[in-house]
């Protein structure tokens, strides 16, 4: 069994079951990269964000790994690469995993008030990405406001080990029991001109909170469900 990253003599780790599909199916059209971000009330200081990232990586050493391909499977290999914070200039969610190249599988970029964290899905899932981003933002705020003596809050269980961080939740919780098969509604088909090959757009909008809550109440759902449901069925 391979040793855990961050421990003496550890150099590689296998992908968990849920991650195995991503290296083989990623391409320029579907990069298998996703993004979480945090928007602050003031412009981001890039140098402070770099220091915060350096501190965050110490807690999550597995994020310094690169993807390698063996004879029969892909695996993550420990690397000495160091992540560099950049100001955002490219479209979101471009390729992070490039075959036969030794590159990190995540990046931290900033734009005005926003801290963006992008990651290749084989490296972590949404839960792990949120934990990383929360730790990053916490470290940034502590460094940015040293005089405020902000508390160093822990977002993970106090007794969580590196083995816990790298555990395969798919193997632990997956069940072969088939659920009830109901009739599925047809998905909504988005019309209009398509985005160029291999690129994404970010669409932002403002809406009245009162109007949103009123409309959600008419449907008997939470406001978040009212916003996300059309996207989920598209």
Show which residues each predicted segment covers.
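Flexible, P/S/T/G-rich "lid" or insertion loops adjacent to the active sites of thioester-utilizing
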Residues: 169-221
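Alpha-helical scaffolds flanking conserved acidic
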Residues: 115, 221-225
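Single conserved hydrophobic/aromatic residue that forms the stacking wall/gate
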Residues: 226-234
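Non-catalytic N-terminal regions of enzymes
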Residues: 1-165, 213-215, 232
């Amino acid at each position: 069994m391979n040793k855990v990253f961050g421990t003496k003599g550890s150099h590689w780790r296998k992908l968990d079951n849920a991650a195995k599909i991503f290296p083989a199916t990623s391409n320029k059209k579907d990069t298998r990269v996703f993004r979480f971000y945090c928007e602050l009330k003031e412009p981001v200081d890039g140098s402070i964000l770099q220091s915060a990232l350096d501190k965050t990586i110490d807690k999550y050493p597995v994020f310094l790994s690169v993807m390698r391909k063996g004879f029969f499977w892909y695996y993550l290999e420990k690397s000495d690469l160091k992540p560099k914070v950049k100001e955002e200039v490219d479209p979101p969610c471009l390729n992070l995993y490039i075959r036969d190249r030794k590159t990190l599988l995540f990046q931290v970029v900033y734009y005005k008030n926003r801290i963006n964290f992008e990651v290749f899905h084989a490296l972590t899932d949404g839960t792990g990405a949120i934990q990383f981003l929360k730790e990053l933002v916490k470290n940034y705020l502590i460094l940015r406001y040293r005089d405020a003596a902000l508390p160093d809050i822990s977002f993970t269980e106090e007794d969580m080990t590196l083995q816990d961080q790298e555990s395969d939740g798919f193997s632990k919780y997956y069940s072969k029991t088939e659920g009830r098969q109901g009739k599925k509604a047809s998905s909504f088909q988005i019309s209009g001109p398509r985005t160029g090959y291999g690129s994404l757009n970010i669409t932002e909008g403002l809406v009245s909170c009162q109007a949103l809550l009123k409309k959600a109440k008419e449907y008997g759902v939470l406001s978040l469900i009212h916003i996300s449901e059309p996207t989920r069925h598209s």
